[in-house]
Curated annotation (Swiss-Prot):
<dbReference type="GO" id="GO:0005576">
    <property type="term" value="C:extracellular region"/>
</dbReference>
<keyword id="KW-0472">Membrane</keyword>
<feature type="binding site">
    <location>
        <position position="129"/>
    </location>
    <ligand>
        <name>phosphocholine</name>
    </ligand>
</feature>
<keyword id="KW-0166">Nematocyst</keyword>
<protein>
    <recommendedName>
        <fullName>Tereporin-Ts1</fullName>
    </recommendedName>
</protein>
<feature type="binding site">
    <location>
        <position position="165"/>
    </location>
    <ligand>
        <name>phosphocholine</name>
    </ligand>
</feature>
<comment type="subunit">
    <text>Octamer or nonamer in membranes. Monomer in the soluble state.</text>
</comment>
<comment type="function">
    <text>Pore-forming protein that forms pores of around 1 nm and causes cardiac stimulation and cytolysis.</text>
</comment>
<dbReference type="InterPro" id="IPR050677">
    <property type="entry name" value="Actinoporin_PFT"/>
</dbReference>
<keyword id="KW-0812">Transmembrane</keyword>
<feature type="signal peptide">
    <location>
        <begin position="1"/>
        <end position="11"/>
    </location>
</feature>
<feature type="region of interest" description="N-terminal region">
    <location>
        <begin position="35"/>
        <end position="54"/>
    </location>
</feature>
<feature type="binding site">
    <location>
        <position position="111"/>
    </location>
    <ligand>
        <name>phosphocholine</name>
    </ligand>
</feature>
<dbReference type="GO" id="GO:0044218">
    <property type="term" value="C:other organism cell membrane"/>
</dbReference>
<dbReference type="InterPro" id="IPR015926">
    <property type="entry name" value="Cytolysin/lectin"/>
</dbReference>
<keyword id="KW-0800">Toxin</keyword>
<feature type="binding site">
    <location>
        <position position="164"/>
    </location>
    <ligand>
        <name>phosphocholine</name>
    </ligand>
</feature>
Length: 207
């Protein structure tokens, strides 16, 4: 399971580390403000995941900004499947979607999902990798934003390859932070002068 929070008006000079406990506290407080959107109105996040598959991934995003997140775009590995499609996320709402491994193949599921911030001309991008074999691979997740004015989604797995393989996340049109979720599940946090994105991922196959 992946949880991501998109917040507005964060300050890059706030250098105090945000711990998993602090994030949990913030999520608890936000539960009084953030409400379920259409996709989660009648189910919990884990209820979106496909049953009968070794590797699935259910993703929830909470929009703490005043900007609607629109034009959701998913790009995943070949033969994997989107079992519940992502939707637009209004301010003050949380929405979820799910993906699964390819049918009949010993492969995991990986890719990116992104939304445009209405009126800002930027895209919020979330990358995940949920492997089939934990002997050689781990769960990974990354979160970031495109530079102002960049809303076009590149073809194929361009953003996934950048967020999974690049050693630095502060060059080019997409800036991001990423983390490995194996021994620990501490949150990944991306900040710039306007926004802050926090995300965490479980370290199991049904992520």
């Amino acid at each position: 399971v992946i949880f991501a929070l998109v917040l507005g008006n964060a300050s890059p000079v706030q250098s105090v580390a945000i711990t998993a406990t602090a994030v949990a506290t913030a999520i608890g407080a936000a539960s009084q403000i953030i409400s379920a959107g259409t996709s989660l109105a009648s189910t919990i996040l884990s209820g979106l995941a496909a049953s009968g598959y070794r590797v699935t991934c259910a993703i929830q995003v909470e929009n703490w900004t005043r900007y609607p997140l629109i034009y959701a775009t998913v790009q995943i590995n070949r033969n994997a499947a989107v079992t519940v499609s992502p939707s637009s996320i209004l301010p003050g709402k949380r929405e979820g979607f799910s993906v699964r491994m390819p049918n009949g193949l010993a492969e995991g599921v990986y890719g990116t999902v992104s939304w445009e911030l209405l009126g800002i001309k930027r895209r919020f991008v979330l990358m995940w990798s949920a492997p089939f074999n934990f002997n050689h691979f781990s769960n990974w997740m990354g979160v970031g934003l495109t530079r102002p004015g960049i809303t076009k989604v590149p073809s194929g797995m361009t953003w996934f390859n950048k967020m999974y393989y690049d050693k630095t996340g502060r060059v080019g049109n997409l800036h991001f932070e990423r983390g490995e979720f194996y021994y620990e599940t501490n949150p990944v946090i991306y900040r710039d002068s306007k926004f802050e994105i926090e995300g965490t991922m479980t370290n199991i196959h049904n992520a």
